[in-house]
Amino acid sequence: EEDTKPLPAPNLQLMPSTHKVPRLGRIACGTPILADQNIESYDAIPDYVKCDFTLICKGDSMINARIFDGDIVCIRQQPEVESGEIAAVLIDEEEATLKRIRLFEDHISLEPENPMYRPLVFWGEDMNRVHIIGKATHFISTIR
């Protein structure tokens, strides 16, 4: 006789536990990055994602890194990154941009992940125009 007992239900956790992380809008010049006037809202981020703030990706310059327009990008605040990492940077203390960073002795290249766009290259003294605000650690994408 065949055993027809139901199998036990697997222990599934459908939604990971989360914590609230500030979403930054435009970053004001000269203010601490997490100052109240820079915070647009808060995102619920899974606890396993370690980040200090989020940004919303605007545009299609990072699509080959699978980061699309409207995605939430999780950023760990740090002033330096390794060459080849994706980071949020401020150029001329203006709006933040997300690019792959290539560091050289005499220049910095901010590289998009889309062949339709050209890298932004800063040589010599112009390298001081670029301020790394943090490393992209994760992104949260919506189903399209």
Placement of each model-derived feature along the sequence:
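Short, positionally conserved secondary-structure boundary motifs
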Residues: 1-68, 96, 103-107, 129-130, ...
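Hydrophobic beta-strand signal
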Residues: 74-75, 88
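Flexible, small-/acidic-enriched active-site or ligand-binding loops
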Residues: 114-123
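Short, solvent-exposed secondary-structure boundary/capping segments
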Residues: 108-113
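Short acidic low-complexity segments
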Residues: 75-82
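Structural motif
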Residues: 70-72, 85
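Short, compositionally biased
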Residues: 83-98, 102-107
